[in-house]
Amino acid sequence: MPKRGKRAAAEDGEEPKSEPETKKSKGAAKKTEKEAAGEGPVLYEDPPDQKTSASGKSATLKICSWNVDGLRAWIKKKGLDWVKEEAPDILCLQETKCSENKLPAELQELPGLTHQYWSAPSDKEGYSGVGLLSRQCPLKVSYGIGEEEHDQEGRVIVAEFESFILVTAYVPNAGRGLVRLEYRQRWDEAFRKFLKDLASRKPLVLCGDLNVAHEEIDLRNPKGNKKNAGFTPQERQGFGEMLQAVPLADSFRHLYPNTAYAYTFWTYMMNARSKNVGWRLDYFLLSHSLLPALCDSKIRSKALGSDHCPITLYLAL
């Protein structure tokens, strides 16, 4: 990913979150070195996949979601190799930064994922963008949330299947200095209403980079980030209101309510990933009627290729 100056980052509102630096004693510094080397409790280990539901039904659907931070760069970093090995039934991508007429040819080589749908801004090359790739042809596909103010940046794809509706989203970042926080709040309200309407028709699966760490357990340094994009009271409240109003359940926290150090994003700065100084910004949210079908919700923290890692959902439908 090319380095961007502060001015450009503030304008586009997509500046990666930075962690506040704190002075460390020699003892603390040694502890940090040990943790970075994997000797402390800080690193997250993805447990073995659970491929049956609570009632014993075997998983029939595997969905993966990944903010790739640029399709072309992600492919160069062997992101497609991971997808081929993971072999999802549906793959959702965010921050593709690629218009549909410039999609890399390698995407056509993905085994089975022949039904491909893309959305990108019409006037901003190399910005935002989402993709949805599926083995099965959806019954219906639509783009955006039906409001002009929010449908200019290629952030949402909706795919309807027989037993559920899948929404993949790249939610707007409030930006460095919170320059887009007011816009983000308008988005949150409109998105919530949109999802509630969808959920009234069929059970809903929402996945993607939702650009908020919901609770303090969902980021490494909560105290230092309460005024930073992704952890403001307004964004956290908006997320909570969405969970209640639609309603939706956080699949990872449903299964792992107290699991700490489970993050999906790490800034490129300050060796954040090796120290696991991260944020959980990527989610699979489910209608409550789908919870009996939930087998597992995974964070593939060892998969490289972006400043986010992929997440995987198993359902027994």
Curated annotation (Swiss-Prot):
It catalyses: a deoxyribonucleotide-2'-deoxyribose-5'-monophosphate-DNA + H2O = a 5'-end 2'-deoxyribose-5'-monophosphate-DNA + a 3'-end 2'-deoxyribonucleotide-DNA + H(+); Exonucleolytic cleavage in the 3'- to 5'-direction to yield nucleoside 5'-phosphates; a 3'-end 2'-deoxyribonucleotide-3'-phosphoglycolate-DNA + H2O = 2-phosphoglycolate + a 3'-end 2'-deoxyribonucleotide-DNA + H(+); a 3'-end 2'-deoxyribonucleotide-8-oxoguanine-DNA + H2O = 8-oxo-dGMP + a 3'-end 2'-deoxyribonucleotide-DNA + H(+). NPM1 stimulates endodeoxyribonuclease activity on double-stranded DNA with AP sites, but inhibits endoribonuclease activity on single-stranded RNA containing AP sites. Residues 22-32 are annotated as: Necessary for interaction with NPM1 and for efficient rRNA binding. This is DNA repair nuclease/redox regulator APEX1. Pfam families: Exo_endo_phos. The record marks 308 as: Interaction with DNA substrate. GO terms for cellular component: cytoplasm; endoplasmic reticulum; mitochondrion; nuclear speck; nucleolus; nucleus; perinuclear region of cytoplasm; transcription regulator complex. The gene is Apex1. Monomer. Homodimer; disulfide-linked. Component of the SET complex, composed of at least APEX1, SET, ANP32A, HMGB2, NME1 and TREX1. Associates with the dimer XRCC5/XRCC6 in a DNA-dependent manner. Interacts with SIRT1; the interaction is increased in the context of genotoxic stress. Interacts with HDAC1, HDAC2 and HDAC3; the interactions are not dependent on the APEX1 acetylation status. Interacts with XRCC1; the interaction is induced by SIRT1 and increased with the APEX1 acetylated form. Residues 1-32 are annotated as: Necessary for interaction with YBX1, binding to RNA, association together with NPM1 to rRNA, endoribonuclease activity on abasic RNA and localization in the nucleoli.
